[in-house]
């Protein structure tokens, strides 16, 4: 079972944001065959909150598209808590425009990308990046979206 707590903390036009159901579809697709039960939060924020979190946790003083905060449970505690995603609506919209992507498709990519980070995937090393990108491409193609790269 999938439980998603969606927090809308952005001033972005709600008509430009995905529906709760769409977030659920994208997360389920990323989790497919990787995790059967999960709880996570998705917080939609403005650039100021994204920038503050990016500075605090990554040392980068700029807003970013998605931040992933995996849940770190103590040993012996077995709960399906995956973690939190913080997605900046303005950055996602700006990137979609700059990259010539449909806004909906870029949102899907950011949710899948962030969810894979929560599962432990990363793109720091070339080999890890190739693996993660291949999974993203496959998941997005299965959802009917084009290759985001």
Swiss-Prot record:
Cofactor field: Zn(2+)
Principal location class: cytoplasm
Species lineage: Bacteria, Pseudomonadati, Pseudomonadota, Gammaproteobacteria, Cellvibrionales
Name of the gene this protein is made from: ybeY
Entry keyword Lipid metabolism: no
Signal peptide segment: none
Organism domain of life: Bacteria
Similarity field: Belongs to the endoribonuclease YbeY family.
Entry EC no(s): 3.1.-.-
Entries under NCBIfam families matching the protein: rRNA maturation RNase YbeY (TIGR00043)
UniProt binding sites for Zn(2+): 113, 117, 123
GO biological process: rRNA processing
Organism: Saccharophagus degradans (strain 2-40 / ATCC 43961 / DSM 17024)
Annotated Gene Ontology cellular component terms: cytoplasm
Compartments it resides in: Cytoplasm
Stated name of the protein: Endoribonuclease YbeY
